[in-house]
C-alpha cells in the first residue's frame, strides 16, 4: 500500500517537473492549480441556470395546450403590473386584496389571503388582531 502511494506521488512529481520545464514560469503553474476550481464553479453556474427556471414579472408562462381554457386559444398568461384591467390581477393588485381568476383550479374567484378591504366579518381571533390579518382561506 505504501509502495502505491509513493508510486503515485513520484508520478505526480514527474508530471509537475515536466510542466515546470515546459512553462518555465511558476505563475502559470499557480494559475493551473486553480483551473479545476474555476471549471467546477462555471459548471455549477451553468447547471443551475438551466435546472431552475426563473419566472420574472411580464414573462410568458407556458401552460401547454390552451384549447381547454374557456374555448379561447389566445389566452395570455402574462403578469403585467401595468395592466390594471387584467382579470387575473397583477402581483401588486393581489397584495392589495385583489382577486385572481384561477383558470387552472376550477375558475371562479381565488382570494389571495392578504389584506381584503371589503371583508365584513372577523378573522376568528375574537378581536385579538385587526381584521386585516385574515386567515387566508376562501370565505
Curated annotation (Swiss-Prot):
Coiled coil: none annotated. Residues 61-139 are annotated as: Disordered. Residues 90-103 have a biased composition (Polar residues). Residues 64-85 have a biased composition (Acidic residues). It comes from the Eukaryota. Belongs to the immunogenic miracidial antigen family. This is Immunogenic miracidial antigen 8I'. The gene is 8I'.
Amino acid at each position: 500500500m505504501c509502495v502505491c502511494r509513493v508510486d503515485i506521488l513520484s508520478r505526480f512529481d514527474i508530471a509537475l517537473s515536466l510542466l515546470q520545464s515546459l512553462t518555465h514560469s511558476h505563475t502559470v503553474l499557480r494559475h493551473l492549480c486553480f483551473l479545476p476550481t474555476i471549471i467546477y464553479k462555471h459548471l455549477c453556474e451553468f447547471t443551475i441556470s438551466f435546472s431552475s427556471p426563473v419566472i420574472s414579472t411580464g414573462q410568458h408562462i407556458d401552460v401547454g395546450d390552451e384549447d381547454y381554457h374557456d374555448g379561447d386559444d389566445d389566452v395570455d398568461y402574462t403578469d403585467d403590473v401595468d395592466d390594471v384591467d387584467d382579470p387575473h390581477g397583477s402581483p401588486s393588485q393581489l397584495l392589495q386584496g385583489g382577486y385572481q381568476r384561477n383558470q387552472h383550479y376550477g375558475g371562479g374567484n381565488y382570494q389571495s389571503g392578504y389584506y381584503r378591504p371589503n371583508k365584513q366579518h372577523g378573522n376568528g381571533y375574537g378581536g385579538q388582531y385587526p381584521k386585516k390579518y385574515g386567515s387566508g382561506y376562501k370565505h
